[in-house]
Amino acid sequence: MNEDPQKKDEPFFKDVEFKASYGKADQIPSQGTPQIAFAGRSNAGKSSLLNAILERKSLAKVSSTPGKTKLLNFFFVNHSIYLVDLPGFGYSANSHKDHEAMMGLLMDYLNLAKDLKCLFLVCDSQRELPEEELELIGTCFERNIKPVLVRTKIDKLNQSDLSKLRKKMKNIHELYPMLETVLVSNKSGKGLPELRKIVYSLIETVKNRLERIEEIS
């Protein structure tokens, strides 16, 4: 990057707007606009993380009742890319039927979203990483989608817990050596700059592509 995208007292991403919600993956129009999606269990802090990355307080709706998000919510960032808040899955208060429906919607999206470039898999650092999440990581690699494992709420871990988490991360990276993992605390801001840079780098890629098209035409 040739310039600092964030000046003092300015948000990292200046132009952010909610665009649309979809109840089914096949309703999403193919626009050729790159997407970064946020997936994870209903209590992992997906929507809070999206708001923190974009430095907006309530862009993505955060509910006190986990599992409320049932739609694919699209946010247009810097006139370049979409950030997609996916429905949460796996919350214990939801029925098995609800869980299957949300997982089905997620997998349909992964299979049909040709513009999806990166998936932020958001996981509470206080919890074990279930097999479903590991399978999602593998699915991303198979489809040439960059997975980023985001371990949230690390401010709630003591040093002993943090040491245990790092050991578990090492085991996961032995399974997926190319996996990028970011430890995040919305409270302290730790890890947010790394995630913003991933988003910004994709915006720069789009910007450079458009400039090349203009030069050719």
From Swiss-Prot:
Residues 32-205 form the EngB-type G domain. Its cofactor is Mg(2+). Mg(2+) binds at S47, T69. Gene3D superfamilies: P-loop containing nucleotide triphosphate hydrolases (3.40.50.300). It comes from the Bacteria. PROSITE patterns: G_ENGB. It holds the Pfam family MMR_HSR1. InterPro entries: G_ENGB_dom, GTP-bd, GTP-bd_ribosome_bio_YsxC, P-loop_NTPase. Keywords: Cell cycle, Cell division, GTP-binding, Magnesium, Metal-binding, Nucleotide-binding, Septation. GO terms for cellular component: cytosol. GO terms for biological process: division septum assembly. GO terms for molecular function: GTP binding; metal ion binding. GTP binds at residues 40-47, 67-71, 85-88, 152-155, 184-186. Belongs to the TRAFAC class TrmE-Era-EngA-EngB-Septin-like GTPase superfamily. EngB GTPase family. HAMAP family: GTPase_EngB. NCBIfam families: GTPase_YsxC. Necessary for normal cell division and for the maintenance of normal septation. This is Probable GTP-binding protein EngB. It comes from Leptospira interrogans serogroup Icterohaemorrhagiae serovar Lai (strain 56601). The lineage of its organism: Bacteria, Pseudomonadati, Spirochaetota, Spirochaetia, Leptospirales.
